């Protein structure tokens, strides 16, 4: 379903190496013309050192011989790699020393570690630049494990003020993502977020752009790490600076936030978060909507159950064709069906199983078994009257204390939204003038 494909929008905020998995996914799904995708890969590869990959793509795209320029580039890349390997070899040997490894594990101060290496191995300041250039070259060649290793060495030695410090964090995160090391990627994502949030040198506009990049890169981590669907809610919905970035620069990210909320396994948290999510979706509906956000609107704003059922069928097609969300399909459909059921029952309080079966597109027997399993697994507060064929929803009283907490949360959230709206209006004038952060000479972009 090309209509709802977000690859082009998302790719604008990704390093070119991170776009390749998305193009491979689209190729399998056959959403676009295969030749167009191959040409897209070839264009992306033109500014990398993955020459063998580029040659393979060229062979699949054209019937003629490999261009001479590509063969020459391969020779140049191999020569550069050998030269950088020779320059870096003595540095790598220092890090292979067992005592150096122990020092790196026990010393958190980069300056102390640098002094140790200088005393024991004659380490010099210019070695840091050599290490960084070699790591970047390895990354451009597609050797992400080598890049991650050397960027780790670089990171532990340089201060946060180093001109390549921030760039090395982006490179390390990209390398771990491309190797699918999700625990390491989550650590790098957290470290990079802290660096961006604590950066007092960047202008507000630069910080906004950096957060927008981080939001898009984080999708790889959040939808693959076991704790990702909790972390994405905390970051995207409850941290004002990141919610502001989504509303200002990339409202399409609401698709991923909404999916994370719907598929969250914590029922109590999910219900509270839904209230806050609905407010954001309503507010941004004029800038972005798709079947996933419209499903929430139909169900929780308009109470349009027929519309929600229709959108749910469309959601299935969207999820199947989305690189980040395809693995969420089963959880999404199951929980969405539960939301329809709960909302319908709360409005009517008591409802016949036959009517529910009709709403859920099930037979009465299937619907009754499904409801029994929900009650048994403590996912639903309800009782079944088998004689009358009715489902009666429970009515849990909310304590005054809990009511105060909910009201306070609501007020706090609305205050944040008001502040963001003011900031959003101020930023709109400068948005079109914002430079593309990817074009800055900062290393890994």
Curated annotation (Swiss-Prot):
Residue runs in coiled coils: none
Tissue distribution: Ubiquitously expressed. Expressed at highest levels in appendix, lymph, pancreas, skeletal muscle, spleen and thymus.
InterPro entries for the chain: eIF3e (IPR016650), eIF3e_N (IPR019010), PCI_dom (IPR000717), WH_DNA-bd_sf (IPR036390)
Highest taxon of the lineage: Eukaryota
Keyword 4Fe-4S: no
Region named Sufficient for interaction with MCM7: 351-445
Assigned keywords, A-Z: Acetylation, Cytoplasm, Initiation factor, Nucleus, Phosphoprotein, Protein biosynthesis
Domain PCI: 221-398
Compartments in which it is found: Cytoplasm; Nucleus, PML body
One GO term (biological process): nuclear-transcribed mRNA catabolic process, nonsense-mediated decay
Annotated family: Belongs to the eIF-3 subunit E family.
Official protein name in the record: Eukaryotic translation initiation factor 3 subunit E
The organism of origin for this protein: Homo sapiens (Human)
Gene from which this protein is expressed: EIF3E
């Amino acid at each position: 379903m090309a209509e709802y494909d977000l690859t082009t929008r998302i790719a604008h905020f990704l390093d070119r190496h991170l776009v390749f998995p998305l193009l491979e996914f689209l190729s399998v799904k056959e959403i676009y013309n295969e030749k167009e995708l191959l040409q897209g890969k070839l264009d992306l590869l033109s500014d990398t050192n993955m020459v063998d990959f580029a040659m393979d793509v060229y062979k699949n795209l054209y019937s003629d011989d490999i261009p001479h320029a590509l063969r020459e580039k391969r020779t140049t890349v191999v020569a550069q790699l050998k030269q950088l390997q020779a320059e870096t070899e003595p540095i790598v040997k220092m890090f292979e020393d067992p005592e150096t490894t122990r020092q790196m594990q026990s010393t958190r101060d980069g300056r102390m570690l640098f002094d140790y290496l200088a005393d024991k191995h004659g380490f010099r300041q210019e070695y840091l630049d050599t290490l960084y250039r070699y790591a970047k070259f390895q990354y451009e060649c597609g050797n992400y494990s080598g890049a991650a290793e050397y960027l780790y060495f670089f990171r532990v030695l340089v201060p946060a003020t180093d001109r390549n410090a921030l760039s090395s964090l982006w490179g390390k995160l990209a390398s771990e993502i491309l190797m699918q090391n999700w625990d390491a990627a989550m650590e790098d994502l957290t470290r990079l977020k802290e660096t961006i949030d604590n950066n007092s040198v960047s202008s507000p506009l630069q910080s906004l752009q950096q957060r927008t990049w981080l939001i898009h890169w984080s999708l790889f981590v959040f939808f693959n790490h076991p704790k990702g669907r909790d972390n994405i809610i905390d970051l995207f919905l409850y941290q004002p600076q990141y919610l502001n970035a989504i509303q200002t620069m990339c409202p399409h990210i609401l698709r991923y936030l909404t999916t994370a909320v719907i598929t969250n396994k914590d029922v109590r948290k999910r219900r509270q978060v839904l209230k806050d999510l609905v407010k954001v979706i309503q507010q941004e509906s004029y800038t972005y909507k798709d079947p996933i956000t419209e499903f929430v609107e139909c169900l929780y704003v308009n109470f349009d159950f027929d519309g929600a059922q229709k959108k749910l069928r469309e959601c299935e097609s969207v999820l199947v064709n989305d690189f980040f969300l395809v693995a969420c399909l089963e959880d999404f459909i199951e929980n969405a069906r539960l939301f329809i059921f709960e909302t319908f029952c709360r409005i009517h309080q008591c409802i016949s199983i036959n009517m529910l079966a009709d709403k859920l597109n099930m037979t009465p027997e299937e619907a009754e078994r499904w409801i029994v399993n929900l009650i048994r697994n403590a996912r639903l507060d309800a009782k079944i009257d088998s004689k009358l064929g009715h489902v009666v929803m429970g009515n849990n009283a909310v304590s005054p204390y809990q009511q105060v907490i909910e009201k306070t949360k609501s007020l706090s959230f609305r205050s944040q939204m008001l502040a963001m709206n003011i900031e959003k209006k101020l930023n709109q004038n400068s948005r079109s003038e914002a430079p593309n952060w990817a074009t800055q000479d900062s290393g890994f972009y």
